[in-house]
Amino acid sequence: MSFIDPYQHIIVEHQYSHKFTVVVLRATKVTKGAFGDMLDTPDPYVELFIATTPDSRKRTRHFNNDINPVWNEAFEFILDPNQGNVLEITLMDANYVMDETLGTATFPVSSMKVGEKKEVPFIFNQVTEMILEMSLEVCSSPDLRFSMALCDQEKAFRQQRKENIKENMRKLLGPKKSEGLYSTRDVPVVAILGSGGGFRAMVGFSGVMKALYESGILDCATYIAGLSGSTWYMSTLYSHPDFPEKGPQEINEELMKNVSHNPLLLLTPQKVKRYVESLWKKKSSGQPVTFTDIFGMLIGETLIHNRMHTTLSSLKEKVSSAQCPLPLFTCLHVKPDVSELMFADWVEFSPYEIGMAKYGTFMAPDLFGSKFFMGTVVKKYEENPLHFLMGVWGSAFSILFNRVLGVSGSHNKGSTMEEELENITAKHIVSNDSSDSDDESQEPKGTEGEDAEREYQNDHQASWVHRMLMALVSDSALFNTREGRAGKVHNFMLGLNLNTSYPLSPLRDFTQESFDDDELDAAVADPDEFERIYEPLDVKSKKIHVVDSGLTFNLPYPLILRPQRGVDLIISFDFSARPSDTSPPFKELLLAEKWAKMNKLPFPKIDPYVFDREGLKECYVFKPKNPDVEKDCPIIIHFVLANINFRKYKSPGVPRETKEEKEIADFDIFDDPESPFSTFNFQYPNQAFKRLHDLMYFNTLNNIDVIKDAMVESIEYRRQNPSRCSVSLSNVEARRFFNKEFLSKPTA
């Protein structure tokens, strides 16, 4: 049965661009002048340039010793019709050292009408005639998807997954507790969340996933969302060729072997050379390269070394029959001069799409990193490998990479790594790239000596390999500066008009008065937190910086709280660092709650004083106080990293008896002076791995009944509230006009 999607009828307005096609047909009587022709026959080629478009410079191949060349080469430019677009045509002569300009002409694109196609002659030096064929059309099918709705692939997945979950949930809960599951409408949407926290989060999440898999809970989940360290485990799991036929148990054993080695062992000359060759290829193609690329390669070599060519879009096969929960990953877009706690756009990644819900703009995964203009790809690159994205998703660790490898000097001797990470802001890690270079040469160069050019590049590459190797194995500036460490990609929203975009979703009334709640004034971590989250992205910047989402708050709730996903039950696992094992565990959850309220998204009230009343527990349940009023508010089961019952029981209900059994479970997580579970520990001996893995495996299994009870409650709520995507046109208009008014305000 198909359902009406109200978000599909909300128009995310955008301006259409023009596609200007130029076919360089031929030229006759190409000349270098009377004297020049006596010395040499021209080797002509044509260069086309439009300054107002990103992929601005294009050129034909050159012909040796040909005064009547026939090229028949077509080139496309994506143009903003509101700009004064002028085509500059340059006839060039290819030489070994420096190419020579034979003549230049211009053509105003505004003289063309949409739908028109014509041949235009150009005369150079009163003798040479060149014929170009030009056409102009509207780009009616952009490469970005502009919509508030989920993509069709995710909708189809959800429908098929509901069918699977209905049977799985009946099996899990038994006939009595699942008697309310009459149809897929009654199936609650369950999401599993994993926090950041480096390898601690990854190892802990591996134990969680094993428990969820073996207990049948995973078969009842629609989504699994990760941030930073948790995304590394999700990437390892979903990229494994034997998953889901082979469960997490076997895959976790492979993971334990992979993380038992020192990451410095990956920095062999042969591997560094291979890394650098790959980065050189990426850089020479016109894509930005940062330290995050290197970090992603190291993470990839550690965790998925035998599948380094895996891409995000290739993970679609893991959900092709809705056999697994849909994996969702995240990073932040940040601005160079603003703290990420004040401003950050959440970017979501799935095997189907990558995009920002705040602006209603999404793209296929293989287009992320390509060069866009006004929603259309102007230069497509190969899809980034999964390990590059793993580096972006966990890029906080590339910032303090010297601490990760233990090669730092005397800097910050009095601070812990956690304290350093706590103090990092976007201003520390993002270079203000004022030049915003397109990496395109604006000067002609020699083209006949292609062998010489290749030799030059090889020499240059070899020297770069040497420098990079020296930098990687020595205490160099590469390690001692944080600036420029953030991931960088081409801005896929370049040239768009954001004046009519929607900040996140038109779920409820979104007027200025709705922001004056006293509860939003209370700071959780910083007085300025989320102060500028309504600001738009800079659509004039050619590149954007993408960083670890944990730098704003360490739980990926924004992915799951999108009302289009209609999540009923959220099971979150928080592996965030705390000052001690007995410290309150709600900081990240409180930040998520505040973010949700500022975006008018339903979220249960988080009472931090439950810690004072009930003490430290393995998990806490937060429900809407009044479900009839707090419509669409999910239930949250929040697991924290705590060693409580695991000390006494080797499995739920089975006490530890021998001295060895008790000793293996007698450990602290944050109070251990040797810090085996530090956020910056990237080597886990087998015992440390097993302790953390088994702890979270136990904690999850020990609370399976809590999860089942919440599922039963969610089924009943679904039956009483079958529609979870109610949107009125008045709400849509209120949000639109609020955004226009906000964006028109002058900044202080």
From Swiss-Prot:
Q: Which GO terms describe its biological process?
A: arachidonate metabolic process; glycerol metabolic process; leukotriene biosynthetic process; monoacylglycerol biosynthetic process; phosphatidylcholine catabolic process; phosphatidylglycerol catabolic process; prostaglandin biosynthetic process
Question: Site of the Glycyl lysine isopeptide (Lys-Gly) (interchain with G-Cter in SUMO2) crosslink?
Answer: K540, K605
Q: Which organism is it from?
A: Oryctolagus cuniculus
**Cellular component annotations (GO), alphabetically ordered:** cytoplasm; cytosol; endoplasmic reticulum; Golgi membrane; nuclear envelope
Question: PROSITE patterns from the entry?
Answer: C2, PLA2C
Q: Give the start-end ranges of region Phospholipid binding.
A: 1-178
Q: What is recorded about the domains?
A: The N-terminal C2 domain associates with lipid membranes upon calcium binding. It modulates enzyme activity by presenting the active site to its substrate in response to elevations of cytosolic calcium. In the presence of phosphoinositides, regulates phospholipase A2 and lysophospholipase activities in a calcium-independent way.
Where does it mainly reside?
cytoplasm
Protein name per the record: Cytosolic phospholipase A2
| Superkingdom classification of source | Eukaryota
What EC identifiers does the entry list? 3.1.1.4, 3.1.1.5
Kindly identify the residues recorded as the active site. S228 (nucleophile), D548 (proton acceptor)
Q: Which residues form the C2 domain?
A: 6-122
Subunit and interaction comment: Interacts with KAT5.
Q: Name one GO molecular function term.
A: lysophospholipase activity
The free-text function statement in the UniProt record for this protein reads:
Has primarily calcium-dependent phospholipase and lysophospholipase activities, with a major role in membrane lipid remodeling and biosynthesis of lipid mediators of the inflammatory response. Plays an important role in embryo implantation and parturition through its ability to trigger prostanoid production. Preferentially hydrolyzes the ester bond of the fatty acyl group attached at sn-2 position of phospholipids (phospholipase A2 activity).
- Which positions fall inside the PLA2c domain? 138-739
Q: Where in the cell is it found?
A: Cytoplasm; Golgi apparatus membrane; Nucleus envelope
PANTHER family (UniProt xref): CYTOSOLIC PHOSPHOLIPASE A2
Give the InterPro entries listed for this entry.
Answer: Acyl_Trfase/lysoPLipase, C2_cPLA2, C2_dom, C2_domain_sf, LysoPLipase_cat_dom
Q: Which residues carry this modification: Phosphoserine?
A: S2, S434, S435, S437, S505, S514, S726, S728
